[in-house]
């Protein structure tokens, strides 16, 4: 049975991932990660950069190109997505850094607030390989996706796909994440 969680490996090269990590580590606009409407490090302990694809940076282009190929494959496997109305890549996305012991262990879905109801599919790119946990757990499907550099994961945003980060006590974790959403 299709759980609608798709994993695509080697979508970004290690060099591309390292380039994005360097951007995260040197960006002056990094701030504590928001969860819902505020910061609560007991539920989500991260450092985030809020980016826009319209900035046309090398980071934007690398991520956009990687996602384009994955979405084509995702839609082939899930053709019903073409019949639900017009939707596309949301302009905003997040680059996130989790320190050892940090993470997002709070189970959540990506359309849990009325302000997020337009979201259709979430995307996440692992930018580094984490060998001490560090993946993403989907408890309803008894599935954990491992954090492997260059790996893209796509899944539905709704309550049917609650997930949470698996905290690494010893290693950093870097991801890029965002959404495909209905467009008016």
Model-flagged regions — what are they?
Residues 1-152, 160-184:
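Fe(II)/2-oxoglutarate oxygenase catalytic core
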């Amino acid at each position: 049975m299709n759980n609608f969680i798709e994993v695509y490996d080697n979508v970004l090269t290690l060099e591309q991932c390292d380039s994005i990590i360097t951007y995260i580590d040197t960006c002056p606009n990094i701030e504590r990660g928001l969860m819902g409407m505020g910061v609560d490090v007991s539920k989500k302990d991260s450092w985030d950069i809020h980016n826009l694809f319209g900035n046309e940076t090398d980071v934007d282009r690398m991520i956009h190109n990687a996602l384009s190929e994955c979405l084509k494959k995702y839609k082939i496997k899930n053709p019903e997505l073409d019949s639900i109305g017009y939707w596309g890549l949301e302009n905003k996305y997040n680059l996130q850094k989790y320190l050892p012991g940090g993470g997002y262990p709070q189970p959540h879905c990506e359309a849990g607030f009325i302000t997020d109801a337009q979201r259709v599919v979430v995307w996440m790119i692992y930018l580094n390989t984490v060998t001490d946990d560090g993946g993403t757990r989907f408890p309803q499907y008894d599935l954990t996706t491992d954090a492997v550099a260059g790996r893209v994961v796509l899944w539905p945003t709704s309550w049917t796909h609650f997930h949470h980060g698996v905290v690494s006590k010893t290693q950093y974790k870097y991801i890029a994440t965002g959404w495909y959403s209905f467009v008016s």
